[in-house]
């Protein structure tokens, strides 16, 4: 939205322009050596991001798919945990024009024996696809328990809520952001990330320039 560097961050800080330019040059050389000129901008950016995360020696990397998941370039990653957020009609020209077809692509990030966290409240046809994939790959399917959520306060700028007895604060408002946060909380539980780090991470999470 503001600059291309915002799409690659470590600890909330954008990749610097010099670092981006350096890695862009390295990826360009690798691309030229393949002799293939059909790589998309997102595929190039994904390669730059993965190389940057490797050089920065990150402990945990959050990798977001570009379109769908099944055929997405991010699917080269072997995840510690997979997260499927809200499935709705998006990129229908590529993913299909039914929720079941779109869900099939989204479920493409599910890997054998890797825990999969699913955004709560999905449509039944979406859940059928995801459930089947999780059973096929023998992976734990985790859906945040909305009955364990207690709303403490919500206004246009802040949300305070508790989940499973632990308090959290968001600066992104809306019920959907709470559900997104629950997915993040469950992912952090799988990764054994301590509560204080989860609380701070959620409190500092923001999407600049997404609302005016």
Predicted features and spans:
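ATP-dependent carboxylate-amine ligase catalytic core
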Residues: 1-77, 93-95
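Catalytic core of IPPT-family isopentenyl/dimethylallyl transferases
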Residues: 204-208
């Amino acid at each position: 939205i503001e600059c291309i560097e915002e799409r690659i961050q470590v600890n909330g800080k954008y990749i610097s322009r010099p670092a981006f330019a350096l890695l862009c040059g390295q990826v360009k050389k690798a691309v030229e050596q393949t002799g293939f000129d059909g790589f998309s901008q997102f595929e190039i950016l994904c390669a730059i991001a993965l190389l940057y995360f490797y050089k920065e020696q990150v402990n945990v990397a959050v990798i977001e798919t570009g379109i769908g998941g099944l055929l997405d370039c991010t699917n080269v990653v072997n995840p510690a945990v997979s997260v499927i957020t809200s499935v709705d009609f998006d990129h229908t020209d590529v993913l299909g024009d039914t929720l079941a077809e779109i869900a099939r692509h989204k479920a493409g990030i599910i890997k054998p024996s890797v825990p999969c966290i699913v955004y709560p409240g999905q449509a039944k046809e979406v859940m059928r696809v995801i459930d089947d994939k999780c059973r096929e790959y023998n992976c734990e399917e985790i859906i945040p328990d909305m009955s364990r959520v207690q709303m403490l306060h919500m206004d246009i700028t802040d949300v305070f809520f508790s989940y499973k007895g632990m308090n959290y604060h968001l600066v992104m408002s809306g019920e959907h952001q709470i559900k997104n946060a629950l997915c993040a909380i469950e992912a952090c539980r799988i990764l054994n990330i301590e509560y204080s780090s989860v609380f701070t991470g959620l409190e500092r999470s923001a999407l600049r320039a997404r609302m005016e």
